[in-house]
UniProtKB/Swiss-Prot annotation:
Function recorded in the entry: The beta subunit is responsible for the synthesis of L-tryptophan from indole and L-serine.
Domain of life, per lineage: Archaea
Family recorded in the similarity comment: Belongs to the TrpB family.
GO CC aspect terms: cytoplasm
Cofactor(s) recorded in Swiss-Prot or TrEMBL: pyridoxal 5'-phosphate
Protein name in the entry: Tryptophan synthase beta chain 1
Pathway assigned to this chain's UniProt record: Amino-acid biosynthesis; L-tryptophan biosynthesis; L-tryptophan from chorismate: step 5/5
Modification sites for N6-(pyridoxal phosphate)lysine: 107
Entry's Gene Ontology molecular function annotations: L-serine hydro-lyase (adding indole, L-tryptophan-forming) activity; pyridoxal phosphate binding; tryptophan synthase activity
Pfam families: PALP
Entry-linked HAMAP family: Trp_synth_beta
Record gene name: trpB1
Source organism: Sulfurisphaera tokodaii (strain DSM 16993 / JCM 10545 / NBRC 100140 / 7) (Sulfolobus tokodaii)
Alphabetically ordered keywords of this record: Amino-acid biosynthesis, Aromatic amino acid biosynthesis, Lyase, Pyridoxal phosphate, Tryptophan biosynthesis
Amino acid sequence: MVNKDLIPKYWYNIIPDLPKPLPPPRDPPDAEFSRIELLKKILPKEVLRQQFTIERFIKIPEEVRDRYAIIGRPTPLMRAKRLEEYLDTPAKIYFKFEGATPTGSHKINTAVPQAYFAAEEGISHVVTETGAGQWGTAVALAASMYDLSSTIFMVRVSYEQKPMRKTIMELYGGKVYASPTDLTEFGRKILKENPNHPGSLGIAMSEAIEFALNHNFRYLVGSVLDVVLLHQSVIGMEAIAQLDELGEEPDILIGCVGGGSNFGGFTYPFIGAKKGKKYIAVGAAEIPKFSTGKYEYDYPDTAGLLPLVKMITLGKDYVPPPIYAGGLRYHGVAPTLSLLIKEKIVEWREYKEEEIYEAAKIFMKTQGIVPAPESAHAIKAVIDEALKAKTEKERRVIVFNLSGHGLLDLGNYESIRRRVEK
């Protein structure tokens, strides 16, 4: 039985603790309509309120905590003892295992409260996008928990790479479409330009928003926006308590970054509590937003339906290559994380997928867990930091977020295995 007392009672909001004020969302100067006002039409009211709050702690509704218990919160904090032995490092390595949830990733942590707030409003149908499929799976399950219908626009390349993700979303009751689709004006425009377009998170996001608007449904946000990172803070809040129970003080905290929700949810409570000496955000070298992106106002979605936010971005029209870590195929970085990177509070790394594949294999062989390709990016940075501790003869405590398992990503693993090991 899960002890509900171990589940956090509050979400943590980093905005009051940022080193400087967060540049606010804004409408484009030549806008025909207000994108900020548009949010009122597509987001559940409480989700919108939380998006703009400056409160440090937000009480988690008891109904949401009940659902958190059902999905297995708190998730385990585990020590990677065999990985330590394999690397012959003096460092201790711990990981928070979000793959222990029914949907296999951290995404359910915000899907549940967003679906709850929609249901409380009397909404009957929710819409979203998904890249690798973890977010869509989480929304389909969360919607079913509150008797809501759901529609999910899945990036085409992932839709084709991961048919089992589509299956599980449909088993949970969701309707899944490969984006770009002919269901929206924006999708039809993209398909007219390129009938074989692989899709992107930005495009799928635009389709989901347009679809929600046209049908008076509500849109659920999967990453990037502040409210998502707020809900994901349960990861870091739990991890702090679990490390305290072990008497451990973390030196280095690491997570992968697509839009930033799992990294922010994991590290922000540590940053706010001034725990840890180094925070490392890890991205894909094939989507080089950390190394070549600009810090400027840009649209989170490709069609430009959402308000402009200041973030590190490759540009809303950037089409990411079809790498095996589909959840990292996004052009931008959450505004709060972008600010922390620009202020040099958070460091970044970018790795090629061949390096990630080798790191994932080491983790599988030592710890027995198949990591999601996205999460394997964090593992590569962990290995590098552990070997650095070995070289410098330092007994560091490294903690990372294993944001999901890869048991539904085996097709992607097989694809890269054929390329790398041919």
